[in-house]
Amino acid sequence: MILVDTLVWIEHLRAADARLVELLGDDEAGCHPLVIEELALGSIKQRDVVLDLLANLYQFPVVTHDEVLRLVGRRRLWGRGLGAVDANLLGSVALVGGARLWTRDKRLKAACAESGVALAEEVS
């Protein structure tokens, strides 16, 4: 299962990403409530339809506040330009065996690599 980050969704909604279309067709693309919340705050076409579709994908687990703080401390994630959503996504992927994160954020990619969280490969 692949957790798709917000920016990947934003770019897909502007111009369809063939790889994401394939993952969706194979039921391999997952979402997270915080990604849905971030997208809900933006201007997206067919807003209600898109948000409903995202909510019906596999939902990655939500980590608790204490779990995020432990992750930040244990993996020394502070001072790297990561946001709270980034830390939550990293933690969620770590909880799901075999899961990967698809992000285009360089800082989040680096944090995942250092934390042992698998990344989905970009396909050009």
Task: Give the ranges of each region predicted by the language model.
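Short, well-structured N-terminal submotif of metal-dependent ribonuclease cores
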Residues: 1-34, 40-52, 58, 117-118, ...
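Non-catalytic, well-ordered alpha-helical scaffold segments
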Residues: 33, 37, 87-90
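Active-site neighborhoods of divalent-metal-dependent phosphate/nucleic-acid chemistry enzymes
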Residues: 12, 18, 59-122
